[in-house]
Structures are given as C-alpha cells and as structure tokens.
C-alpha cells in the first residue's frame, strides 16, 4: 500500500525499540519506551512548512502523530512542527 501525507504532514517509519540492555537484560514489552526516532518515508506537498526530505533520520515529540500500519509495519503520520531535529 502506498500512503501520501497531505499538507504539512510527514510519514515516518520508527526505529526499532531496544529489547535488551547493554548488559544483556531483556526489557519486557510493558517497560519498553516508545522510540522518538525514525526515517522519513514520504512528505506532504506543503513545501514551505516541511523542512525534511525522504530518507532523513528525524527525532519527533514523544506523544505526537497518528500510528498506522502499512503492509504490517508500524508508521507514524506527524505534522511537520512535531519534528524536533534531524539526525546527521
């Protein structure tokens, strides 16, 4: 399925959540924190507000966006102002 965000929205594929600590302790699902990083998969057509492009790694607000599944993979649709940084 192909999803094209509208306006100033951005489609992000979140990074995988860590399931193990550096010391080897397994973190249960209930204790795992939602990741705030991901890769931009698609952008809307509002070029004035959107300052990122497809393929860039970004950090977003913790509770922002709408979670959707595309072909069984979790994604987030975020407003461009919910993005807080680009990871270089």
Curated annotation (Swiss-Prot):
Gene Ontology molecular function: any one: protein folding chaperone
InterPro entries, per the entry: Chaperonin_GroES, Chaperonin_GroES_sf, Chaprnonin_Cpn10_CS, GroES-like_sf
Annotated protein name in UniProt: Co-chaperonin GroES
Subunit structure: Heptamer of 7 subunits arranged in a ring. Interacts with the chaperonin GroEL.
Annotated SMART domains: Cpn10
Subcellular location(s) per record: Cytoplasm
Keywords attached to this entry: Chaperone, Cytoplasm
NCBIfam families in the record: PRK00364.2-2
Main location: cytoplasm
Biological source species: Treponema denticola (strain ATCC 35405 / DSM 14222 / CIP 103919 / JCM 8153 / KCTC 15104)
Gene Ontology cellular component terms for the protein in this record: cytoplasm
Lineage: Bacteria, Pseudomonadati, Spirochaetota, Spirochaetia, Spirochaetales
Listed GO biological process terms: chaperone cofactor-dependent protein refolding
One Pfam match: Cpn10
UniProt entry tagged with the keyword Chaperone: yes
Biological role: Together with the chaperonin GroEL, plays an essential role in assisting protein folding. The GroEL-GroES system forms a nano-cage that allows encapsulation of the non-native substrate proteins and provides a physical environment optimized to promote and accelerate protein folding. GroES binds to the apical surface of the GroEL ring, thereby capping the opening of the GroEL channel.
Encoding gene per record: groES
Keyword Cytoplasm recorded: yes
UniProt family annotation: Belongs to the GroES chaperonin family.
Matches recorded under PANTHER family: 10 KDA HEAT SHOCK PROTEIN, 20 KDA CHAPERONIN, CHLOROPLASTIC
